[in-house]
A protein has these predicted regions:
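Metal- or metallocofactor-binding catalytic centers and their adjacent structured scaffolds
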Residues: 239-273, 455
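Conserved short loop/turn motifs at secondary-structure junctions
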Residues: 24, 104-105, 181-185, 264-273, ...
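Alpha-helical scaffold elements adjacent to nucleotide-binding pockets in ATP/GTP-utilizing enzyme cores
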Residues: 38-42, 88, 111-119, 139-143, ...
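C-terminal or mid-to-C-terminal helical accessory/interaction module adjacent to the motor/catalytic core
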Residues: 135-219, 264-265
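Intrinsically disordered, low-complexity regulatory segments
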Residues: 1-162, 171, 246, 354, ...
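Short helix-coil junctions and helix-kink-helix linkers
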Residues: 279-292, 481-491
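Basic, low-complexity terminal or inter-domain segments flanking catalytic cores
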Residues: 4-5, 10-27, 38, 45-47, ...
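Core structural elements
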Residues: 161-171, 217-219, 267-279, 297-311, ...
């Protein structure tokens, strides 16, 4: 009997153990593996977190993919190459106890969740969607406790944008191929941005500089200072030429300079609001020299999660695609505690920031650190150089936004000489406030010396300076993003790709930091301005963005927007196709002769960049790459090392003496030899290292780039 009971007990234990091992887990689906890794560490063993690797369904690339006869119905297909990923998602979903869709908290993320729900046969009206503004343990666990249905307003807003862009791109691009050159394309928002850049270039070309003169005087008092002439008989003065300037100086030399009016004021400077996507892109360009693409790449890393020593995996910043400056009460309270503990009560103010734009999605916050106590310098060792720079920028801006104003003492003095009035100003910082953490490039304190009304001043010099009015500056990435935001063109997720797209299409080029339109860019925008005026009109583009926002909050039906747009657009297409004549592209002839037939080579544009082709085409089909020397001699033969491209378009560096010399490098060589083995050093940049490494695979020498 005892044996039977023991066997029975063992069977029960085995069955229980088997039941435990087959217990179903909850499945959480996110976009990226790094995000999955971070969230997986927060949720524990009862959850499995996997990544969809972005979109799984989209419009086909091979055709328009919009059923115009069926009220603009999108013809979605599974994205090519995602078959195995979709199989994995279906398998995991089928085996799961419950499925949560945790894609990003914006239109694009909502649309990805909707497509996933379709593929996994989930009901989008069921509470399957979880959202969080920051990837921290508390935020993620709270989101899992509060799932909601998929918001179809946001999905439809994304669908409307996608279909609009497809209608424009897949209709105008073939027209450009036929009339200008194959391979060209036109986008809705990008075309409006290109128009802005081209209009600025036209302003610069049409600008006629005007001469003007400035007169300044130096004075000796308790401290030397300078004043500038700005009034004549109480009116603003304009000095147009040298003769007028000389006459004024002659008059000034006949009279005394007398202090006429002194005003002293206390002025305050307010801290800036926390970053939006746009202001982060602008500041990172101006302060740490990141372009918009790099800014968003690094910001995405900070958002999705970084392994911090002593803390673990954590998303360091809140969601990075936002046009809101609002901050949650919890984040403001955390900032208050930090400021009081580290700087004192006199530095805390607790500012609230209202969104300036009515379209701002108030469900989002401004960009901020997820944990204000993770001070940039304290976690620097856990971050790459670029991550540290950007995190410090975000952290400083947020903490400063909750601090008191900076206070200045301002003094201004009018100095009179006959009918002429000079103005001198000075200021001094008397309380730093938010500047304690958010340093700004400002002139050093320049207080005026003690002055009294009626005081005669000793003149040390009178200086005349010839000047000319300057044309408007070309756009930089930062100033273009600022202008796009001011004109309400695009949204946080669209700013970064715009410049890259226009450069890839060869519509603009970089000149140092400036953006300059190419001849091709002008050709395309002139055609579009004539035949598709609305597409390139900034007001029309801004109004369309507002309509898309209305779709997002379910005020407007997304199909109504498409119907209103496509009718007139279809007629414009017909007119353009009839009236635009074929434009013969100008060919740039070089002084390089073809080694096969002796004719001159011409510069051509290809998929992987510029190359040389024989002008005798099609009789002679000789082509060769354009050689760009990097200024480093080949260690084998002494000839120049040049930049080259592989068949797949990847850049590498090889000897210009090829095929006689086959020396080549994947990393860019520098004109410096390894102190250990004598081989050339090459540039290398990874998440954890930026500097020079030895090109000899058997040598481990490396040196970091000094910051």
């Amino acid at each position: 009997m005892l044996v039977v009971k023991t066997l029975l007990k063992g069977s029960i234990l085995m069955a229980t153990a088997k039941k435990k091992t087959t217990r179903k887990k909850n499945l959480v689906i996110v976009e990226s593996p790094s995000k999955a890794k971070t969230i997986g560490k927060f949720l524990g063993s009862s959850y499995k977190v996997i990544a969809s690797a972005g979109h799984v369904r989209d419009l086909p690339k091979s055709k328009m993919g919009i059923d115009l006869e069926n009220d603009f119905e999108p013809q979605y297909i599974n994205i090519r190459g995602k078959g195995e990923k979709i199989k994995e998602l279906k398998k995991e979903a089928k085996a799961a106890k419950r499925v949560y869709l945790a894609t990003d908290p914006d239109r694009e993320g909502e649309a990805i969740s909707w497509h996933l729900a379709y593929l996994l046969q989930m009901d989008p009206e069921e509470p399957c969607r979880i959202v969080f503004n920051e990837i921290t343990k508390e935020a993620v666990k709270n989101a899992v406790k509060n799932p909601r249905p998929i918001e179809m307003g946001l999905v439809d807003a994304q669908q409307a944008r996608r279909v609009l862009d497809r209608l424009v791109g897949y209709s105008i691009s073939p027209l450009l191929w036929r009339k200008v050159r194959r391979g060209l394309s036109a986008g809705r928002v990008q075309s409006a941005a290109l128009k802005i850049i081209c209009d600025r270039e036209n302003e610069i070309d049409a600008f006629v500089p005007e001469e003007y003169w400035n007169i300044t005087s130096g004075f000796s008092a308790e401290k030397d200072f300078e004043a500038k002439l700005n009034l004549y008989k109480g009116e603003k003065i304009k000095i147009s030429n040298e003769e007028q300037s000389h006459k004024i100086v002659e008059s000034l030399n006949k009279n005394d300079f007398v202090v006429n009016n002194i005003e002293a004021k206390d002025r305050q400077r307010k801290p800036y609001a926390p970053y939006t996507t746009s202001s982060l892109q602008q500041d990172s360009a101006n302060k740490i020299n990141f372009n918009t693409k790099k800014t968003m790449q690094i910001a995405q890393q900070l958002y999705e999660g970084v392994e911090i020593k002593g803390v673990g995996m954590i998303g360091l910043v809140s969601y990075i695609r936002t046009d809101s400056t609002r901050i949650s009460d919890e984040a403001r309270f955390a900032a208050k505690e930090f400021i009081l503990d580290n700087y004192g009560e006199q530095y805390y103010k607790g500012n609230k920031y209202e969104n300036k734009r009515k379209e701002a999605q108030d469900a989002h916050e401004g960009i901020r650190p997820s944990n204000v106590n993770l001070v940039p310098d304290d976690i620097k060792e856990s971050l790459t150089t670029d991550q540290y720079k950007l995190y410090k920028l975000i952290w400083n801006r947020f903490v400063a936004s909750q601090m008191t104003n900076a206070q200045y003492k301002y003094v201004g003095a009018d100095i009179v000489n006959g009918d002429y009035t000079f103005r001198a100003t000075g200021s001094q910082l008397i309380f730093d406030g938010y500047l304690k953490v958010y340093k700004q490039d400002r002139d050093e304190d320049s207080l005026l010396p003690p002055l009294e009304n009626g005081q005669k001043l000793d003149v040390s010099y009178i200086n005349e300076e010839q000047c000319f009015t300057q044309p408007p500056a070309r756009f930089t990435e930062a100033s273009l993003v600022k202008t796009l935001e001011e004109l309400n063109i695009g949204r946080p997720s669209t700013y970064a790709p715009i410049v890259g797209t226009l450069i890839d299409r060869r519509y603009i080029k970089r000149m140092k930091k400036s953006l300059c339109p190419t001849e091709l860019g002008f050709t395309v925008i002139n055609l579009m301005s004539e035949y598709f005026e609305e597409i390139v009109d900034t007001r029309f583009t801004a109004e369309m963005e507002e309509k898309l926002d209305e779709v997002g909050v379910e005020i407007t039906d997304w199909k109504d927007i498409l119907r209103d747009f496509y009718g007139p657009f279809e007629k414009q297409l017909e007119v353009a196709d009839k009236e635009i004549e074929k434009i013969e592209e100008e060919v740039e002839i070089t002084d390089i002769k073809c080694e096969l037939c002796g004719k001159y080579m011409v510069k051509k544009h290809g998929r992987f960049g510029d190359f040389l082709a024989c002008s005798g085409y099609p009789d002679c089909k000789n082509t060769k790459p354009i050689v760009v020397s990097i200024g480093v001699p080949c260690p084998k033969c002494g000839k120049d090392l040049v930049e080259k491209k592989s068949r797949r378009g990847k850049i590498f560096y090889g000897c210009s003496g090829y095929p006689d010399c086959d020396q080549s490098y994947w990393n860019k060589p520098v004109n410096k030899k390894c102190p250990k083995c004598g081989a050339l050093l090459t540039e290398k940049k990874t998440k954890k290292f930026e500097g020079l490494v030895c090109s000899n695979s058997e040598c481990d020498y490396k040196e970091k780039v000094e910051e």
